[in-house]
Amino acid sequence: MIDESTADGYVFRVDLRLRPDPVSTPVAISVNSAFAYYENVGQNWERAALIKARPVAGDIAIGAAFLSDLSPFIWRKYFDFAAIADIHAMKRQIHAVRGHETIAVAGHDIKLGRGGIREIEFFVQTQQLVFGGRRTALRGRRTLD
């Protein structure tokens, strides 16, 4: 119902592929299953998404505890070359989908275009992923903290 399209548009679009193992698990999984997933097969794009995660509904304390317990997954002390290559691949994919045309003042997409908001956020999150495990000051959810 929440992602249903009405005459007024979507209430809220939900992409159910953006969750642990979407092909073989139910929409909601146990906390232990989530921990096992992230510990064993969690990916860098999920780390990046979890940087900004925060509980917003339900039992806020349980949500905060979950994110706190997931902290070692999000904030790795040692980031290997494969992980850095994976981040580069994410950036290449963004450019392939969105393109990376030159900046033109008239009609330039300030959100998704070259040098736009999303590119700045990606740069900041990359720095957080690479260095946040050792530098706790980089662990903020806001881009401009």
Residue ranges and their predicted role:
Residues M1-D145:
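A nucleotide- and high-energy phosphate-metabolite-utilizing enzyme signature
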